[in-house]
Amino acid sequence: YNPLTWQDVITLTRIKDISSLDRALAFLHRAYSYVERTEYYKLIRLLVKERLDILPAEVDNIPKIIENKLLYFIKSLGYNEVLVYPNFLSYKEMVNIDKLISNQIVLPCQPRVETPDSKVLIATDFDQRFTYILSEKDILQNFIESVNLEGFFCNKKTPESWSYKIIQGEEKLDWSEDMENYYKNKI
């Protein structure tokens, strides 16, 4: 199978932009309590009616579709082991990268994968559908090119909820209405 890019999903759904797509995905797994009605229904239509082979973004985990690519890239930098830990524990375990790649060891939820010298950190936070890669800009640029990643550069001023916006009026859809529509099969 060929993975879809986020731009592919935007094109297939005709969702306005990456921020609207992120809000729809956040609402889908209930990280946001409301969403733009038309944008959300575009995503749902794609997932449940048009393309049943598409899985929405994984939450709380590094997406399986890129996990090994990221680990292979870290190996290409000369590392054989990484520190692995969840975001809610301070204990860090040194793990052989090959054991992660072969699934002998599985990453925890909300994982942190860090090189022993702290030059690279890959992290997925609680209830988030995106993965952060922290490093020096030249390493990040190589990551992007070799792993074929989509995204954007963040800094200390980029909020975690970068796509969040207040939605009002008829366009606002909340959880209770969404569940009611789900049970009535109006989607």
Which residues are covered by each model-predicted region?
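Extended, low-hydrophobicity segments enriched in charged/polar residues
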Residues: 1-100
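Residue-identity detector for threonine
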Residues: 5, 11-13, 38, 115, ...
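Generic serine detector
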Residues: 19-20, 33, 76, 90, ...
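Hydrophobic alpha-helical membrane-spanning segments
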Residues: 47-50, 63-76, 117-124, 141-146, ...
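Short helix/strand-capping turn motifs
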Residues: 75-131
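Alpha-helical oligomerization segments
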Residues: 122-187
